[in-house]
């Protein structure tokens, strides 16, 4: 089983704020996510600028595309994104359109599982050639005190068994990682637990060490 990658979510409102994080920890992570908040705040230039600074890193545009899949994904890929996200409630043709464009750029599409979705939809995504999903505990759910539970682990295992590469996100803390041991997680996303740590560098390194211990 390969080691899960570590992704930092830049859900900053400005590039200046995002750079405060990347200057410290860009070299400690595998994937740099231009979070939805940053996408809205700064547009696709955020993707372009971060990829120019870190060409050796995977840069994800977390656009959560809901419609106009070809247009929006092309905007992201022309800004040199490696991956883009499509929200799970989008029509299957939106996801297909985004994937078609991704292939032109040797990129990839992730389905963001935020909110309601069904296993029938999951099968449609696989049938369409989608290979990545993001299992997401929402920011608002976290704020309401919703913790990771057995239902989450069962769903993640089932998605993996379907052939998806699964990314896990949603207020992920270091102590949560053992919950997922034994599952071939593709990526763990850490946002505030790294960005807001007293030492973001050490926080990122702790995540990497724990991943190596649990999946190595």
Swiss-Prot record:
Cofactor note: Binds 1 Mg(2+) ion per subunit.
Enzyme class: lyase
Gene3D superfamilies, alphabetized: Aldolase class I
One Gene Ontology term from the biological process aspect of the record: L-ascorbic acid catabolic process
Inducing stimuli: Induced by L-ascorbate. Repressed by UlaR.
Name of one Pfam family that matches: OMPdecase
Keywords on record: Carbohydrate metabolism, Decarboxylase, Lyase, Magnesium, Metal-binding
Protein's UniProt keywords contain Lipid biosynthesis: no
Primary role: Catalyzes the decarboxylation of 3-keto-L-gulonate-6-P into L-xylulose-5-P. Is involved in the anaerobic L-ascorbate utilization.
Name under which the protein is recorded: 3-keto-L-gulonate-6-phosphate decarboxylase UlaD
Gene transcribed to yield this protein: ulaD
């Amino acid at each position: 089983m390969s080691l899960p990658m570590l992704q930092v979510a830049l859900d900053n409102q400005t590039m200046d704020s995002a750079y405060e994080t990347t200057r410290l920890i860009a070299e400690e992570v595998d994937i740099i996510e231009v979070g939805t908040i940053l996408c809205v705040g700064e547009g696709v230039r955020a993707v372009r600028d971060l990829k120019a600074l870190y060409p050796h890193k995977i840069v994800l545009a977390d656009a959560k595309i809901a419609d106009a899949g070809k247009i929006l994904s092309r905007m992201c890929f022309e800004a040199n994104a490696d991956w883009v996200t499509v929200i799970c409630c989008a029509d299957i043709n939106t996801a297909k359109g985004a994937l078609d464009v991704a292939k032109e750029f040797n990129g990839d599409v992730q389905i963001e599982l935020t909110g309601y979705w069904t296993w029938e939809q999951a099968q449609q995504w696989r049938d369409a050639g989608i290979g990545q999903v993001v299992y997401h505990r929402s920011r608002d759910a976290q704020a309401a005190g919703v913790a990771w539970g057995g239902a989450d682990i069962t769903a993640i295992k089932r998605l993996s068994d379907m052939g998806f590469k699964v990314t896990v996100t949603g207020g992920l803390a270091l102590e949560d990682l053992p919950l997922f041991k034994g599952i071939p997680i593709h990526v763990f996303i850490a946002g505030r637990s790294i960005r807001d740590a007293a030492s973001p560098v050490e926080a990122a390194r702790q995540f990497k060490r724990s991943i190596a211990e649990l999946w190595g």
